[in-house]
UniProtKB/Swiss-Prot annotation:
Interacts (via SH3 domain) with PEX14 (via SH3-binding motif); forming the PEX13-PEX14 docking complex. Interacts with PEX19. It comes from the Eukaryota. It comes from Mus musculus. This is Peroxisomal membrane protein PEX13. Its main location: membrane. Residues 177-198 are annotated as: Interaction with PEX19. Keywords: Membrane, Peroxisome, Phosphoprotein, Protein transport, SH3 domain, Translocation, Transmembrane, Transmembrane helix, Transport.
């Protein structure tokens, strides 16, 4: 009887560990290994290695603003295109003094490829935003007054022209009637005889030539008086025009210079001169544009106060070296607290010294209070929205983790 072939291996026999020999009492045999068991499964026991994954970055400022909000102070003035041709007439023509438009002032600073602007361009626009908004409001106010005066002037002017048209029609009617009556020789003869009769009876003195000379003298006197009044009335618009031309640029320059001084004072928080907020970087961040700054985990950053923070969701205005400012993701740093600036400390020290010199007896009983808690409470509202959208639980600061600086 022929021997039967050996049965196929069982599942538990095919999942032997590589290198293990056959069971005791059995001869050498093949070693089976499963396909799903690789050499990497056998690791040495020990502490597992954990890597901190940085939280996701919220949309960048250039993606949030886009091309709709970058022109907040670059509107296109195209509202002045009015003409008053409806009030005109065939005899004097229509009056349309204002027909213009400022369509060249509105443009988009983003290029076609939607690259974010440089840090210099953004800083220049942010520094001049308030000044241009003030100028824009002034321009709109003058534009509204100009449109009102334009409408009033057009209404008065066209009413005056309508009255002149009526007077002109009456004068034409008089001329036509005069021509009709003067066409008759009989009327002229009767008129001549009537005047001669008046001269003969003494009812009319002088001759006809003297009457004509007297009438011409009165006409010349009236014309000279009207010319003097016209020349005097034409002088004040010239002075007003030059006042606007010279005074407008001066006012704009004063507004820009004043706003630039305020912007320079508002950037002292980066160097620590003014009050600022201190934060510690929890993750590494690499900037992808000039409006951002790079930092590494463990770096100490100075953050701007709540009033100076840009209205960008999930991003904060910060400085690493005290000179360069840029945006950083809010969920990559941990807020430590608010620190008083050097100017504030010096001014408070000088004030205390002056008070101690002037009234030393009252200073002994005064208990000094630490304003750090109040300052921190005022600044917590800046990061409320950031803490909600942050995915990492340790990426934002809590009240218990803040340190007194």
């Amino acid at each position: 009887m022929a021997s039967q072939p050996p049965p196929p291996p069982k599942p538990w026999e095919s999942r032997r560990i590589p290198g293990a020999g056959p069971g005791p009492g059995s001869g050498p045999g093949p070693t089976y290994q499963s396909a799903d068991l690789g050499p990497t499964l056998l690791t040495r026991p020990g502490q597992p290695t954990l890597t901190r994954v940085p939280p996701p970055i919220l949309p960048r400022p250039s993606q949030q603003t886009g091309s709709n909000n970058v022109n907040t102070f670059r509107p296109a003035y195209s509202s002045f295109s009015s003409g008053y041709g409806a009030y005109g007439n065939s005899f004097y023509g229509s009056y349309s003094p204002y027909s213009y438009g400022y369509n060249g002032l509105g443009f988009n600073r983003l290029r076609v490829d939607d690259l974010p602007p440089s840090r210099f361009v953004q800083q220049a626009e942010e520094s001049s935003r308030g000044a241009f908004q003030s100028i824009e409001s002034i321009v709109h106010a003058f534009a509204s007054v100009s449109m009102m005066m334009d409408a009033t002037f057009s209404a008065v002017y066209n009413s005056f022209r309508a009255v002149l048209d009526v007077a002109n029609h009456f004068s034409r009617l008089k001329i036509h009637f005069t021509k009709v009556f003067s066409a008759f020789a009989l009327v002229r003869t009767i008129r001549y005889l009537y005047r001669r009769l008046q001269w003969m009876m003494g009812l009319r003195r002088g001759s006809e030539n003297e009457d004509l000379w007297a009438e011409s003298e009165g006409t010349v006197a009236c014309l000279s008086a009207e010319d003097q009044a016209t020349n005097s009335a034409k002088s004040w618009p010239i002075f007003l025009f030059f006042a606007v031309i010279l005074g407008g640029p001066y006012l704009i320059w004063k507004l820009l210079s004043t706003h630039n001084d305020e912007v320079t004072d508002n950037t002292n928080w980066a160097s620590g001169e003014d009050d600022h907020v201190v934060a510690r970087a929890e993750y590494d961040f690499v900037a992808v544009s000039d409006e951002e700054i790079s930092f590494r985990a463990g770096d100490m950053l100075n953050l701007a106060l709540k009033e100076q923070q840009p209205k960008v969701r999930g991003w904060l205005l910060a400085s690493l070296d005290g000179q360069t400012t840029g945006l950083i993701p809010a969920n990559y740093v941990k807020i430590l607290g608010k620190r008083r600036g050097r100017k504030t400390i010096e001014s408070s020290t000088m004030l205390k010294q002056q008070q101690s010199f002037t009234n030393p007896t009252l200073i002994k009983g005064v208990t000094t209070t630490n304003p750090l808690d109040e300052q921190e409470a005022a600044f917590e509202s800046v990061f409320v929205e950031t803490n909600k959208v942050s995915s990492a639980p340790d990426s934002t600061g809590k009240n218990g983790d803040k340190q007194d600086l």
